[in-house]
Amino acid sequence: MTAILERRESESLWGRFCNWITSTENRLYIGWFGVLMIPTLLTATSVFIIAFIAAPPVDIDGIREPVSGSLLYGNNIISGAIIPTSAAIGLHFYPIWEAASVDEWLYNGGPYELIVLHFLLGVACYMGREWELSFRLGMRPWIAVAYSAPVAAATAVFLIYPIGQGSFSDGMPLGISGTFNFMIVFQAEHNILMHPFHMLGVAGVFGGSLFSAMHGSLVTSSLIRETTENESANAGYRFGQEEETYNIVAAHGYFGRLIFQYASFNNSRSLHFFLAAWPVVGIWFTSLGISTMAFNLNGFNFNQSVVDSQGRVINTWADIINRANLGMEVMHERNAHNFPLDLAAIDAPSVNG
């Protein structure tokens, strides 16, 4: 038998680069999506840290009343934030070279746009990188599909909502108290708590937490012991072992008796699909809800819908929410508007019955 060995031609520099980028042997997989992900996320992270520490106040409402957001200008970790780009800029693309000076760029909140646009591109590439690595390893693509939920949520609050409202100044500030401010104002202007898609998102997040805790506790309680009583049950697991590590029949039997038989999964694949799909679909719906409310298709309004035979209003919780919404709307951007839009109309809605 004769073996013929051909000398392999030396690869070009580009070929070696391609092999390195797509190699699954690297400690951290890079991938073609990673080529774009790494610089965009590094840029977003670097600018966020610098701006959170040292950015000067930003004229968010476009009325020459700058709002401070950085640590060096009097904030702490809780109150600090990257202040959104000024309403004077609106939806215009506002890179550094579009401003007359760096001071003007900072005053108009340029860092917010820079961070948000790089961040969204980066997390989208991270999702693509998850798909790419799954493809290289011969896995199914559902990890990237699951990650699409937080990507959709971030895109909704940082991009779709500002587009719908006409200005990046309406985007979510990048900070703790700024996030809560965004939520309160969103409720005041769009009545999000009464939107069915937000309700589905709440069910998804809280339901997902419940199901995760239930699943983890059931599995941990039905481990197949491979150790003595003097050793931890966790020590009996070997990474990559072919045998089941817990008894799904025991877990199914326990839960079936605790609730009822058909409340428990007897198929591990169906169970784990359900655990993944429940929160993901819920967050998808909330993202869709934010994206529709961006264009002022708001939550249900049942204000003063209950009246007696004489036409007098019987106040319900919907009317209480209406009063709260008006109060929150009065308080926000108090120097930019004399009245909230609801109160500035010729015929103001009656809230006293």
UniProtKB/Swiss-Prot annotation:
SUPFAM superfamilies on file: Bacterial photosystem II reaction centre, L and M subunits
Residues at which chlorophyll a ChlzD1 binds: H118
Post-translational modification summary for this protein: Tyr-161 forms a radical intermediate that is referred to as redox-active TyrZ, YZ or Y-Z.
Positions bearing Phosphothreonine: T2
Enzyme class: oxidoreductase
Keyword hit for Iron: yes
Lineage top rank: taxon: Eukaryota
InterPro entries listed in its UniProt record: D1/D2 (IPR055266), Photo_II_D1/D2_sf (IPR036854), Photo_RC_L/M (IPR000484), Photo_RC_L/M_CS (IPR055265), PSII_D1 (IPR005867)
Function recorded in the entry: Photosystem II (PSII) is a light-driven water:plastoquinone oxidoreductase that uses light energy to abstract electrons from H(2)O, generating O(2) and a proton gradient subsequently used for ATP formation. It consists of a core antenna complex that captures photons, and an electron transfer chain that converts photonic excitation into a charge separation. The D1/D2 (PsbA/PsbD) reaction center heterodimer binds P680, the primary electron donor of PSII as well as several subsequent electron acceptors.
The protein's name: Photosystem II protein D1
Gene that encodes it: psbA
